[in-house]
Amino acid sequence: MLPPVVLSGITYAGAIALMACGITIIYMSTRTFNFAHATMATWGFYITYVCYMLYGGAPYQYFPLSFLFGAMLGVICYFGINRPLLRREASPITLMMSTMGYDIALLATIQIFCDYLTYKLRLYPRRVIMSTYETMVWGVPASFFISLILAVAIPVALHMFLTMTKFGVAMRATIENPTLANIIGIDAEKVYLASWIIGGGLASLGGAIVSMTITGTPVMGNMIIVTMFAGSILGGLYSAYGSLLGGFVVGLAEYVGTWLLASYWGGWLLGYRMVIPLIIMAGSLLVFPEGLAGLPWGALLAALKGALPGKGKEVSS
């Protein structure tokens, strides 16, 4: 059996992959870096926590509600902020800054919500350890299986949606060439709305899952926003599939890498865990700015085959 830190690391990495994918989907369609992703993730945790405390059962059964709530937050952001700015052809900087304002508003509502939970429902929501409510399956936390299954199932579902449905094909066309898509009659605004629904839903779903591995607080999302963006950038800002891979790699490197370093150099290193995704993000931007999806994988595989013994030269008879 894998060590507990590796199991938690894989769970954490799967959640980061989902959130990084949400960032990329929104950016690909609207060219907006969604900094509200952080607090959307926190809201996903609180939806799961409150439903579990009020209605019981297992925390995982409320993950779909977290997704739906995040999708609603995405719809509000699109109609209230993003669409008016897109219609005015706002710059990417303006679009990004507008999401920071939305993030502040969401964070304020979380603080109010936590006060309500404390004084009216007698809950203690400002420091929650959701792992205490875990269900064990064959000696392994159930969140491990859920995170791993979703990290595989969502890319498959996303691929089927984008390639096998009429709206998915229209969405791809709009992302690749918005002007041409409008000319042939595709409603770009529906595509933008769909991207915010998917992106917001993935943010809150990822937040609900990641709370099973870290302490849930009102600022939980702000503690992992660097990791989310590092995963999105490593995977490639123009590839939803790449962002899933990038998010998983960054999340696993941060969680397990920090533990390995702390085991050798001391626990004081745990306070610097954000350095790992920062280094990965900086290295990615310097070495391959288009991310993993932009690498010439065909040429790399051909070069690897050529370097193998007996593959680089033809044997003459």
Annotate the PLM regions.
Residues 25-45, 59, 90-93, 167-170, ...:
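Short, non-helical or kinked segments that cap or interrupt transmembrane helices
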Residues 56-102, 245-250, 254, 288-289:
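Alpha-helical transmembrane segments within multi-pass membrane transporters and channels
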Residues 84, 92-164, 263-274, 299-317:
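Transmembrane helix-bundle core of multi-pass membrane transporters
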